């Protein structure tokens, strides 16, 4: 009698595990942050078996915050220096980065959505979305600072980088998996899409490429 092997695919285990966490730790090692790496990784990984996918991201942000400086501007400077090389700016929607790089953006969404840090936080998300989409991280800013964030979104829609333009369109989609709803008026969405598409057409015409 043949024994049937049972396999269960786990997206959370594929995306967030010891291997992916090491990529974040390796990057932090290259910054001025001085921290206990083994303790940092153990604290995160010990909790993973009891956490679902989004909860794992939230937990990594919580643990990371305990190792970063209390001063937000210093902390995001470290995170910016830890970011990997930008994604290919010519790639299309099937390329939005490795999920471990959601952590820096979510850190900024949790701790930087304030009057004091609004400008630097949005600037960070523009940079981080070139590594992993910040479409989820931008949403707390849309809810708390709708006017300022929509101005930022419109600027992103005209950016030369595909991934930044993608943030403009995906960040204001009403619904995304695991994300809070984006309360953006339909006419604002259409306006951003029109700006984005116009910019993409200009780039396509200038570069003679289909990847816009």
Regions found by a protein language model. Name each.
Residues 1-212:
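Surface-facing alpha-helical segments and adjacent helix-coil boundary elements at the starts of domains
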């Amino acid at each position: 009698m043949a024994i049937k092997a049972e396999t269960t695919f786990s997206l959370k285990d594929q995306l967030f595990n010891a291997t992916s966490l090491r990529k974040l730790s390796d990057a932090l090692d290259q910054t001025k942050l001085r921290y206990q790496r083994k303790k940092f990784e153990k604290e995160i990984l010990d909790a993973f078996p009891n956490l679902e996918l989004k909860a794992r991201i939230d937990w990594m942000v919580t643990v990371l915050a305990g190792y970063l400086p209390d001063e937000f501007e210093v902390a995001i400077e470290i995170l910016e220096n830890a970011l990997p090389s930008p994604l290919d700016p010519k790639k299309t929607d099937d390329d939005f980065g490795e999920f471990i790089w959601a952590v820096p953006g979510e850190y900024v969404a949790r701790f930087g959505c304030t009057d004091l840090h609004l400008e630097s936080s949005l600037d960070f998300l523009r940079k981080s979305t070139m590594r992993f989409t910040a479409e989820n991280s931008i949403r707390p800013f849309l809810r708390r600072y709708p006017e300022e964030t929509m101005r930022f979104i419109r600027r992103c829609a005209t950016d030369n980088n595909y991934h930044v333009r993608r943030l403009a369109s995906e960040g204001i989609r009403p619904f995304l998996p695991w994300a809070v709803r984006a309360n953006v008026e339909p006419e604002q969405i259409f306006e951003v899409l029109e700006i984005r598409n116009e910019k993409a057409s200009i780039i396509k015409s200038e570069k003679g490429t289909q990847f816009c």
